[in-house]
Amino acid sequence: MVTLYLHVPILLLVVITARAAPKPDTHNPFDELSSVAEKQDLHYGDRSRKDPFIAQNDVGNNFRDGTQENLTKVRSKVNQYDQPFTFKCPLGETIKSIGSIHDNHYEDRQWDIDCKPAGYTMGISTWSPYANDYDGSMNFECNEGSVVTGMSSIHDNYYEDRRYQLMCSYLNNWKRGSCAWTSYTTYDASFVELTPTGKFLVGMKSQHNNYYEDRKFKMLYC
């Protein structure tokens, strides 16, 4: 008996898929936070607030704004994690918004600060001494007639904390009038504070927590 072996060629089809080069990461978390406010038209923070910044709703980020007219995109960070920074508003401008994002890997915050025209003739500007020690509390206010126009900070990896200096600028013919503190922000949470219409940022309080290795902040607006 003759056995025939039939060799059938096997065709292998190799499909090569061309992949486009990955797009650069342009995600900006500050823009994401700001877009929430713009879309939902809300005031953010704790429902229990009893000041001119009373919140109507929560979004879980302790993200707050002053008034709808003041809503603005917080555009870019002013520091890298673990790195020092110094920020000053341009001459004749004051703080329009101040925002921050916390990172649990670095145990540090990135800050964003935006400015607006002061509407007053500006006099002398001075930097404060450091307003806090590492792991210590902060309770700072500019002198009467002056408003916050800058922030400087250094970070320490041993304490996983920052020390802060604030710059105050004198506004000619401006007096404080009515003032109000915001409520504290939340440890490990992002926040954006927008200066209410007709007000200025004049003070800041802060407390550090070693469990969270983070600070919570409250702002004084007049």
From Swiss-Prot:
It comes from the Eukaryota. Residues 21-75 form a propeptide. Disulfide bonds join 89-115, 142-168, 179-222. Residues 1-20 form the signal peptide. Sequence repeats lie at residues 100-109, 153-162, 206-215. The keyword Disulfide bond applies. GO terms for biological process: collagen fibril organization. Keywords: Disulfide bond, Nematocyst, Repeat, Secreted, Signal. Is not glycosylated. The keyword Transferase does not apply. One of its GO terms (cellular component) is extracellular space. It is found in: Secreted; Nematocyst. Is potently cytotoxic (EC(50) value 79 ng/mL) towards L1210 mouse leukemia cells, has hemagglutination activity on sheep erythrocytes, and is lethal in crayfish. Has no phospholipase A2 activity. Belongs to the dermatopontin family. This is Millepora cytotoxin-1. It comes from Millepora dichotoma.
